[in-house]
Regions:
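Single-pass alpha-helical membrane anchors
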Residues: 3-27
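Lectin-type carbohydrate-recognition ectodomains
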Residues: 47-223
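Compositionally biased low-complexity segments enriched in polar/charged residues
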Residues: 1-6, 26-57, 63
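Short linear motifs centered on Gly/Pro in flexible linkers and helix caps
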Residues: 23, 30-31, 38, 69, ...
């Protein structure tokens, strides 16, 4: 027969064995984190807005009026809720002209706002007087529409519309190749303002690099 002391020792031994087994079991079922189970953020899974140039438009041919600047008021370049990607003035052999232009798609643009450059002399129809007009949508904005208008006081201005972006835009300054300045609208046919397919125009201005040449300075912007 076991004494009471021996019984107590046996109970403690059995209880110790049970505790050890319980600890070993639970330790083996704990999942430790490792590199293969941790999901790291990946740029490829983050959707960023982008522009894509995929719509070609034109303003339709209309009389170029012997090259007088005021005849540009017949042409309205309008991309509606998208940004303008490029534009150039085109002449035909019948004394007509039109603007060809591309509209972007995509992006994260909204809040259309109306702007103008303010009236200034039309210079008797000389194209170089357009250098007094700076079409500028400002930072984080895209140009969506513009047209030249005139009043009854021999003055011109650009009306234009801008779209603000919900995401920051990164811009670069561009300049067209200078072309000969004769004072006629036909001078603009050498001035091709064109951004990459993932960019939009945010500003442009006619300049005179020399007394007998013109060029456009403009900005191309993207996400």
């Amino acid at each position: 027969m076991m004494t009471s002391l021996q019984k107590k020792i046996l109970v403690l031994f059995i209880f110790s064995i049970i505790i050890i087994i319980w600890i070993l079991y639970n330790d083996s079922t704990i999942t430790q984190p490792n590199d293969s189970t941790i999901i790291q953020p990946n740029k490829s899974t983050i959707t960023q807005p982008i522009f894509a140039s995929n719509t070609t438009k034109n303003t339709g041919f209309n009389d170029r009026g012997g090259g007088n600047t005021i005849f540009l008021d017949r042409h309205n370049l309008n991309c509606d809720s998208n940004g303008i990607n490029s534009f150039i003035l085109v002449n035909d052999e019948k004394g007509n002209m039109r603007y060809d232009y591309n509209c972007s798609s995509g992006g994260n643009l909204q809040k259309l706002s109306d702007k103008d450059t303010g009236f200034n002399s039309d210079g008797g129809g000389n194209i170089i007087y357009l250098d007094r007009h700076n079409i500028d949508c400002g930072s984080n904005s895209a140009l969506a529409q513009f047209n030249l208008i005139r009043n009854n006081n021999n003055q011109l201005r650009y009306n234009y519309k801008c779209l603000s972006s919900n995401e920051p835009l990164y811009c670069r300054n561009m300049t067209t190749t200078p072309g000969k300045a004769t004072g006629k609208t036909s001078d603009l046919k050498t001035q091709n303002l064109s951004c990459n397919n993932d960019e939009v125009i945010s500003s442009f201005k006619l300049t005179r690099p020399t007394n007998d040449s013109i060029a456009y300075q403009y900005k191309c912007c993207k996400y």
